Amino acid sequence: SNCRVSAFYATAHKYHDTLEACLSEDNIPPSLYDGLIETVHENLKPLHEYIALKKETLGLDEFHAYDIYQPISNAADSFACDFDEAKVKVTAALSPLGYDYQAALQEGFDKQWIDIYENKGKRSGAYSWGIYGVHPYVLLNYQPRYNSISTLAHEMGHALHSYFSNKSQTYINSDYSISVSYTHLTLP
């Protein structure tokens, strides 16, 4: 089984356990992993309160994972806007990240790093992609609603992470793991 293979690998390479072996691939110390898990556990109360409120508001007897995506109001509709206004909103929301970040974000907008709208044959979803020495590209399927604004901010976060990593690191050191990619996108 996969578990036995992982255990064998960890033992053969003299890791303390399989967790340490898995984390070592991304150069993540187990203490960081443990700290992230501990922080999540210490801060579950607001999530539980939100789920209880959502369950009550939706009139559900049981709450399932898919219910998390069910809207409880139309408030998000008030965020609906065209792409130009979305850029303004995202820029304002990311202003705490400073001048360099704002300048790079504006460069991405001005120099058309983003494939914005749905087209025939275009893949669904959204993602950021790039290679060293070339600015990143972002694929969106923008619609005038809150989720698209949020997705724009999220994907530009990935794009600017790549941009700054490539700008400040050599080729050999510019790549990063998915763990790093998603940890940096969580702003206080």
Locate predicted features.
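Cation-handling catalytic/transport regions enriched in His/Asp/Glu
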Residues: 1-185
